[in-house]
Structures are given as C-alpha cells and as structure tokens.
Amino acid sequence: MVKTNINKGYVNQIIGPVLDIEFPSGTLPPIYSALKIETEDGIGTVVEVQQLLGDNKVRAVSMRSTDGLKRGVEARDLGGPISVPVGISTLGRIFNVIGEPVDEQGDVSYDETLPIHREAPAFTELETKPSIFETGIKVVDLLAPYRRGGKIGLFGGAGVGKTVLIMELINNIAKAHGGVSVFGGVGERTREGNDLYEEMKESGVINENNFKESKVALVYGQMNEPPGARMRVGLTALTMAEYFRDVNKQDVLLFIDNIFRFTQAGSEVSALLGRMPSAVGYQPTLATEMGALQERITSTTQGSITSIQAVYVPADDLTDPAPATTFAHLDATTVLSRNLAAKGIYPAVDPLDSTSTMLQPGIVSGEHYEIAETVKETLQRYKELQDIIAILGIDELSEEDRLTVARARKVERFLSQPFFVAEIFTGSPGKYVSLEETIKGFTMVLKGELDELPEQAFYLVGNIDEAIAKAETLK
C-alpha cells in the first residue's frame, strides 16, 4: 500500500458492505482511492471509493466484512488505488484482493507494488500481427488454436477436466515458453480453490521448498468474500500478470475462474450503490466494466498476456447479458464434452464445438487449415452415421462410410493425450506435442497410411511415432 498521511475522514454510515465516509472540506479522495479503516482486531479494513456524494462525503465499498465497524471511526486515505505486490516473490503464494498473503506461509518480501487500476496499453505498444500460442496439446493446437495475447473461453460442467487442463497449460507455458501464470479465483467455491492449490503442490506447479521456482501466483476472492472483493480480485490478478509481461518481458497465462462471477459481483455492488439496473437486473455499466478488464489483456511488443477464462452460463442461456458481453471479447472457445469424458478420452475437448478466430488461411499454414477442416468433416460424418450404426450395425454401411468411421475413431482416440500433471492418474508419462508433429500425425491417419493399425494404438499417445510403436506392442 502507498503509505502517506494525506487525508483523514470519519465513517458516517454503514449499510452492509457499503460505507459513507465524511472528509474535511477540500480533502475528498478521488474515485477508486483506497481508504484504510483501523479495526479492533488490528487487521484493518480497506475500502474503495466508488461515488462522490456531495456534502464532503464519499461512498465506498469494503474489501472485507464490515462486522464490528462503528460510526465515527477514522478512515485514512492511502493516497492512491489499492496497490498489490508484484514480481517473482508472488510465485507459489496465494493472495487476497488487497495483496495480502492468505496461505499461512509467512510474509512476502517484495520490492514493488502496483495499483490495480491502470490504463490499457496504448495502441502504439500493441503487437498487431496475430500469432499462434502453441500449447503442446494436440486437439487445441490443431482445431481451436489460441492466439498469443488472446482471450479464450473455457466451457465445461463439473468433473469434465477443467482443472487438469488448466494445470497442464500452466506446466507447458513454463517449460516450453519460459513463461509464468497467474490464477485469479473469482467468486468460486473455497473448496475448489483449496483443491486446486493442493493439486498444484502435488503436480510440482508450486514448489513448496523454493517458492521462486513455482510456475504460478494465485489470487483468490471466493464466494464467501463481500462483493467488493469479488469485483476487484480479477484486477489484482491482472496487475500481477502485467508486471511479468511489461517488466520481466515474459509470456504470461492469466486464468480467471470464473468471469461470470466478476459480472455478478459488479451487479451486486451496483445495486448496493443504488444505481438503476439494466437488462435482467445487471448493472448499467456492464459493458464498460468488462471492457476495462479485457482491454488490459493483450500482446505488446514486450510480451503477452494470454487469458483463459472459465465461463459459467446461467441457466444455459447464451443470450444472458453476462455471457453475451464476454463472448464479444473472446478469440477462441474450448468446450469440454461430458460424452468424451465418459468415453475416457482426455482432454475431453469437443472437436466440433470448440472454435477459434485463428483457424483461417493467412494466419495458420495452408496445410494446417486443410487438415483441421478434414478432421472436422470426418468427425461430423461419423456423428451423423452413429444413429444408423446404433440401429442397423456397422456392417450395413457402405464401404466408403465404414472407412470414414474407422478413421474417425482413430482420429477421436488420437486427439487424446497423456498430460504431465495427470501422470499419477494415467500411469503414462506426459507428452508435449509440437504443432508440426500434430499436423503430420493427423495427415497420415486421414490419408489412410495407418489404416491397418488397431484403433487402441492411438489412445493416450503423444505423436504418431508413439502410436506406431504402441501398435507393435499390441500385436
């Protein structure tokens, strides 16, 4: 925090997480200023100015529970917005919205803090040439490639492998790109946050013996926090990611789980501040709030922030203003399918539902585009034939269709892959597959060069050479 002794005011009114604070004439703090209120437990409460009410009063939203606060207590202006620690010392640690460590691992020694409210990079600093961000995951790189500095929506219900996919991406960016990740837990269950932390320690993404060798920093503002904290925790995570991009000049992965909760918290705060609601009861500032966050996630000439955002769709209604506003910012969508997970095909990324604006000639190579389209056509045809197979059996199909089905089943299995972070579950060592290897493998399958191999040879392998070697052992 910025330590200055500028202005002091007094709490005038408390309504849940919203406080009115009165200042002496001419000393009103600007909007988004952080104020600190000392509390009897000695921890203190940080609040953020949201409105100037006139009569020398401001209305602020608290970042923690206001239980026990009284009228008349002193509020000190901290001389700027909420500021949080940044840099290598944040790796392996869990922070709350105001940058305090909450993992009971002691204090964090940091050299620098940055305010969470900052301008998006200027147009002159942006990297304008679109480039692919290689993840080493076959199904993603081939069919719905991520843009470097882009925004990806991750859709999936409970238990289909979102967490494992997130951890594999964190692992791969560290190994292949020398990058780091920041995970922002926004308004999700505390149990999930704890499980993720434990799994990260288990899989080596967080190194407990030497935190600075960890690959990720975590920022949590979970369901039990007041709406002010949930609304700002995404900005805290983003600020930490921006430092790695702008100062350390690294490629950064920023995970936001869940972007819908960011909107939901904004809606709660808006209602508490007495603003007139807009469509479906959301805040009137929905588009600008979302834009302020998303515009800062981008590639500059120095480095990139690629963001993967889990998207909860309320009542499965894609036209709801919250997901609809999010979609406007996304470059790619990764949809996880329960049917594939039930078949044991992991990662359970749906090859037909997942999309990317990067999959077009001129951005990807002609060969890549062609093979991706052929894979989708083959899988689509297989999907159409499944009803006929279920009723009449595969023998009733034409020779051509039987060949299509055989190849589609091989493609489906070849889209599975053993993950580094899931070695304990699969018993297979993890594999990073380059885009070149991926294209080569699928080309061979679809051209019929491997028609004589059994389909189980393609299941949970890395590149095509491993599938051929596995087929030898199956003979």
Swiss-Prot record:
GO terms for cellular component: chloroplast thylakoid membrane; mitochondrion; proton-transporting ATP synthase complex. It is a peripheral membrane protein. The keyword Calcium does not apply. It holds the Pfam family ATP-synt_VA_C. One of its GO terms (biological process) is proton motive force-driven mitochondrial ATP synthesis. It is found in: Plastid, Chloroplast thylakoid membrane. GO terms for molecular function: ATP binding; ATP hydrolysis activity; proton-transporting ATP synthase activity, rotational mechanism. Its EC number is 7.1.2.2. ATP binds at residues 156-163. Its main location: plastid. It catalyses: ATP + H2O + 4 H(+)(in) = ADP + phosphate + 5 H(+)(out). NCBIfam families: atpD (TIGR01039). Belongs to the ATPase alpha/beta chains family. F-type ATPases have 2 components, CF(1) - the catalytic core - and CF(0) - the membrane proton channel. CF(1) has five subunits: alpha(3), beta(3), gamma(1), delta(1), epsilon(1). CF(0) has four main subunits: a(1), b(1), b'(1) and c(9-12). This is ATP synthase subunit beta, chloroplastic. The lineage of its organism: Eukaryota, Sar, Stramenopiles, Ochrophyta, Bacillariophyta.
